Amino acid sequence: MHPDAQLKTALKNGFDPKLLYKEPLTTVKEPVCSILEKHSKVPVDKVVSHVNEVRDRAFAVFPYACIGQFSFVELSIADSPCYREMLERTKQGHKLLDLGCAFGQELRQLIYDGTPPTNLYGSDIQQDFLSLGYELFLDRAILPDSQLIAADVLDKQSALFQRLAGELNIVYISLFLHVFDFEKQITVAQNVLDLLKAEPGSMIVCRVTACRDQEVLAATQERMPYYYHDLASWNRLWEEVQKQTGVKLSVESWEQPDELVKKHPLPGIYILGSSIRRL
């Protein structure tokens, strides 16, 4: 479901978006603070107010949790054990897509750490999120808007596939797959494989919300219709993808420490990290 439709449904059912609104920040954590100072050239004494102002403007139009809770300044890509490899490969010319990139904040981390912007792409179903990324990072002259593509990953006719099918070396997916049920996740995974070069070493890196207690999760499905994996279901997903596509993959997974899970209302939630490599 498109995020606009999800929001409208929630509001219709009586959801109060103020519940998603966190009090203004008094500090901005690293690495975003340094990125805004050195990459975006925001004066040191203006960083906090700049972030708060962008959040408030965005939330007035798009009252989503990722905006209200300042998730866009909580970067995670560098926490992945695959980050060093992703960084070195993109420095050498390999092409990376951040799928479901929101404000494109993880792309700015890669640029700040030395990746040429021309080797990076971002895609989100919400064009306004891509535009808000420019309001936050003030870097349209550094990261051309041609590198950011508004598209639905389920639409094989979209600009994303017209431009990048078979062209990418790495696709990064963070906290995105859970909005789809299991069957649609299979389709998403197959579509992502179509974006990658059909050669050994092409890689998907994932950061996935997972749940140890699937019975607790099942009880919440009506009011929170997300599909949170456990390790068994995650492995089953990629086994099914290999079966349906005939593509051989190597899947490695791990539990990844993450501040996000401390805020989650359900017990047993954790972050599952994974790399999926084409053999």
UniProtKB/Swiss-Prot annotation:
Name of the top EC class for this enzyme: transferase
Keywords on record: Methyltransferase, S-adenosyl-L-methionine, Transferase
EC number(s) per entry: 2.1.3.-
GO biological process, one term: terpenoid biosynthetic process
Pathway entry: Secondary metabolite biosynthesis; terpenoid biosynthesis
Binding-site residues for S-adenosyl-L-methionine, renumbered to this chain: 124-125, 152-153
Record keyword Iron-sulfur present: no
Keyword Transmembrane tagged: no
Top-level taxon: Eukaryota
One function term, GO molecular function aspect: methyltransferase activity
InterPro entries: Meroterpenoid_MTases, SAM-dependent_MTases_sf
Family statement: Belongs to the class I-like SAM-binding methyltransferase superfamily.
Function per UniProt: Methyltransferase; part of the gene cluster that mediates the biosynthesis of paraherquonin, a meroterpenoid with a unique, highly congested hexacyclic molecular architecture. The first step of the pathway is the synthesis of 3,5-dimethylorsellinic acid (DMOA) by the polyketide synthase prhL.
Official protein name in the record: Methyltransferase prhM
Organism expressing this protein natively: Penicillium brasilianum
Lineage, opening ranks: Eukaryota, Fungi, Dikarya, Ascomycota, Pezizomycotina
